[in-house]
């Protein structure tokens, strides 16, 4: 039966969200209910956020399961599935690929109370990777510790990744009217969203039930993102569909948006702290092709290290003088900053978390 542990319960929900089957099991024991509202407010909020994310990821999950059915490539794959020649791929059994675009590194350890962070040792494969939640950038081909608050689980998106999500808030079985795509820089990418009509019995990949919408990114020299008009069973998707395009980890750029070659207006916003550019397109015919161009290309961007350090230090249960001295070292020093931090603070988790941000973007 185990014992109540709100923190671990929140971590297990996070793991469940990035698993093939996500269910909250309990027993006849009246104390073992797993509904989020049975836990403390922090755990309840975290569970709710992750369960809503799971619902948003249905287009990604459904497409991954279609791929598993027809191509034999499972949703969850061990590291050695993709990197059989790498020794490290056999040494991290709890780390796994989740679909074609993501790498999941679950945390199941308790947070260190002073730092209010928990850590997990990870191997990051070659290439450039982006944290799906906090936008940190990692250069792969190495092992490192990843530290997160209880609100976060390390999930990394590869360069060029495209993650489709549903933004429909009401429950239902229909395909979404509002979609989002999280688009990560640094490489070309493509993702075909598979949907079905919810009625026709499936008898093969090419039967009449499927609708396919291809999303593609050309990163350089001139950045271009395309949503192709739906192919196949067009009746399976809404006639009109709204899109929210999130270009992650980029410098601000001015987009030109066209639908079948005709310019249309988009609502554009930029988060300079998280370095995310967002375009919102309303009521676009699903059968028409949308193209977003950035005339001068786009540049990859990373969050300011001092801002990241401030977030970590502001939460830490240590003296204010130490916090100020550590932040000053992050701002003024580069290669020697870690040595200075180690001379100021003895908490290895806190020092490790600061080391992660000092080196996560390749600096």
Features from the language model and the residues they span:
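Intrinsically disordered, low-complexity segments enriched in glycine/proline and serine/threonine
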Residues: 198, 265-268
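Extracellular or exported targeting regions of proteins
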Residues: 263-264, 300
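Mature N-terminal, pre-catalytic/accessory segment of carbohydrate-active enzymes
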Residues: 294-363
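Catalytic core of carbohydrate-active enzymes
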Residues: 2-255, 260-261, 287
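A surface-exposed beta-strand-loop module
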Residues: 267-290
